[in-house]
């Protein structure tokens, strides 16, 4: 049930910090979230890709071609891991600088979110209470029907479904009514939050810390990131050349062997 309320809260207050805001957890840094996601994604691709390569090499065609793809895949995975390790400090520095530049704005927005949260919490609590009551009423109405079904035969299945349908529809209608009431209650606070954000951004423009300045600083950081990443990417290119050349030689050898067999026939 708590998940229902939290979901509605997230829909009401969108943003990357919404989950931590409502659960009162210490928010994970933006860079940590990006880094964790990228690590999981890359590892999943690497593992699944290796499985496919292993399956192909174990097949009759793979054995006949003898391309040694698995060896090349492991070499490639090792090279990519080294690149990721080398780029880690560079991207960390970029993200740290960007977070410092926007720290003031984020602090002000966090204060606004906390204030709005205190105002809307009673409405969320009331919604949760009413939802509990509706579910309990539905359970009490359905319980006798379940007992009746257990005591009856299969022919009563349709009869049971006919009795359950209006009860389920009633629960859905009442739930929609409660959600609509909650939406109307929260609407003014949602508008208030949007107005606060607009005011914060307007204050940035008038105070000299304009959005254009933030954009310029972010562009500078991205440019610096690109310059620092160039040598690492060049190392990656050099590391891939032997792998690609080995793969090319294996494929050409397989084609040549196949041609000889065809000519011999």
Curated annotation (Swiss-Prot):
- Region (10 X approximate tandem repeats) residue ranges read 67-265
- Gene3D superfamilies per UniProt: 1.20.5.20, 6.10.140.380, Apolipoprotein (1.20.120.20)
The entry's family comment says: Belongs to the apolipoprotein A1/A4/E family.
Q: Which InterPro entries match?
A: ApoA_E, Apolipoprotein_A1/A4/E
Q: Which residues carry this modification: Methionine sulfoxide?
A: 109
Write out the annotated subcellular location.
Secreted
Would you tell me the protein name for this molecule? Apolipoprotein A-I
Q: Does the keyword Repeat apply?
A: yes
Q: In which tissues is it expressed?
A: Major protein of plasma HDL, also found in chylomicrons.
Which keywords belong to this entry? Cholesterol metabolism, Glycoprotein, HDL, Lipid metabolism, Lipid transport, Lipoprotein, Oxidation, Palmitate, Phosphoprotein, Repeat, Secreted, Signal, Steroid metabolism, Sterol metabolism, Transport
Q: Name one GO cellular component term.
A: extracellular vesicle
- One GO MF term, please? protein homodimerization activity
Question: What Pfam families does UniProt report for this protein, alphabetically?
Answer: Apolipoprotein
Query: What does this gene product do?
Result: Participates in the reverse transport of cholesterol from tissues to the liver for excretion by promoting cholesterol efflux from tissues and by acting as a cofactor for the lecithin cholesterol acyltransferase (LCAT). As part of the SPAP complex, activates spermatozoa motility.
**The protein's assembly and partners:** Homodimer. Interacts with APOA1BP and CLU. Component of a sperm activating protein complex (SPAP), consisting of APOA1, an immunoglobulin heavy chain, an immunoglobulin light chain and albumin. Interacts with NDRG1. Interacts with SCGB3A2. Interacts with NAXE and YJEFN3.
Q: Which GO terms describe its biological process?
A: acylglycerol homeostasis; cholesterol efflux; cholesterol metabolic process; lipoprotein metabolic process; peptidyl-methionine modification; phospholipid efflux; positive regulation of cholesterol efflux; positive regulation of phagocytosis
């Amino acid at each position: 049930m708590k998940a229902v309320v939290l979901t509605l809260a997230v829909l009401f207050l969108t943003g990357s910090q919404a989950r931590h805001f409502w659960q009162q957890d210490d928010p994970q840094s933006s860079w940590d979230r990006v880094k964790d996601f990228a690590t999981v994604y890359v590892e999943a691709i690497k593992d699944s890709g290796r499985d496919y390569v292993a399956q192909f090499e174990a097949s009759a065609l793979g054995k006949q071609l003898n391309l040694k793809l698995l060896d090349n895949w492991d070499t490639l995975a090792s090279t990519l891991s080294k690149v990721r390790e080398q780029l880690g400090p560079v991207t960390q520095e970029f993200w740290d600088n960007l977070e410092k530049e926007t720290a003031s704005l984020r602090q002000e927005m966090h204060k606004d979110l906390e204030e709005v949260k205190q105002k809307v919490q009673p409405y969320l609590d009331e919604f949760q209470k009413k939802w509990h009551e509706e579910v309990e009423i539905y359970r009490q109405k359905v319980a006798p029907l379940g007992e009746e079904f257990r005591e009856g035969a299969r022919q009563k299945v349709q009869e049971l479904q006919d009795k359950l349908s209006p009860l389920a529809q009633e629960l859905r209608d009442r739930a929609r009514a409660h959600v609509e009431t909650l939406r109307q209650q929260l609407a003014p606070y949602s508008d208030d939050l949007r107005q606060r954000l607009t005011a914060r951004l307007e204050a940035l423009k008038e105070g000299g810390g304009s959005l254009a300045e933030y954009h310029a600083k972010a562009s500078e950081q991205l440019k610096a990131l690109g310059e620092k990443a160039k040598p690492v990417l060049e190392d990656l290119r050099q590391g891939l050349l032997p792998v690609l050349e080995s793969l090319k030689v294996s494929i050409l050898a397989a084609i040549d062997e196949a041609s000889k067999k065809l000519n011999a026939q």
